[in-house]
Amino acid sequence: VNCALDANVAKVRKDFTVEAAFQVAGGTACGLFGVSGAGKSTILSCIAGTEQPDRGYVRLGELTLFPPAFPVYLRPIGYLTQDPYLFPHLNVAQNICFGIAEHNGAADKIWINELRDRLQLDSIWRAPSYAISGGQARRVALARMLARKPNLVLLDEPFTGLDRHLVRELLDALGHWHKTLGFTMLVVDHESEVLERLCPQTIAIEAGRIVQQAAWSELRANPATPLLAQLLAPL
């Protein structure tokens, strides 16, 4: 399903009001880039439904996500953050398959097996989730997010704290499924390298406002603000 994202949200915070209006073409990937505390995660939370905007709207294709017309858990959205949020009382397989047991057909089994094999989860498939490593938990969380084949994927710095080898593995897997499944993707990360790998287009955020939306080549060649130029400068 090719679902374009159309978001226009405002959320009042103590330090400033986050106001962002943008569109992401269906099946494409877009980044949100800026310093910590700029409002990137707030925007993502408003789209995911974990926070309610104070005003505005969020649309995904023909669906109106805000104002809410149906429960958050029914939204065709995958949302991945720094914390895997695995269910500690379930094993790895149960975590990944949570919520799709009622669709236990042959196609679902093939898809779950693909996730298991690509993310190298076979050796921990029946392990309790509390007994696996942090890197393994990130793999499980990615598999669980993709298990239901969401139309929109939201990533809020899910690779923070991981070694570069694992980050490359997860980026390769995510890029592969983005191409094959065709979901729309919005990615928050403080590492420009991660965003460049996943997202041809990026939105730069400063103090809750969009200051530039462009391809990475344009952002690097002509940053719109001094702060953005600093963030994009080599170390």
Regions found by a protein language model. Give the residues of each.
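ABC ATPase NBD coupling module
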Residues: 64-78, 102, 219-223
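Conserved ABC ATPase "signature" region
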Residues: 107-124
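A short, proline-enriched helix->beta-strand linker immediately N-terminal to the Walker B motif
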Residues: 147-151
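Catalytic Walker B motif of ABC-type/P-loop ATPase nucleotide-binding domains
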Residues: 153-156
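Helix-to-loop junction immediately C-terminal to a conserved catalytic motif
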Residues: 48
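Conserved ABC ATPase signature
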Residues: 128-132, 136
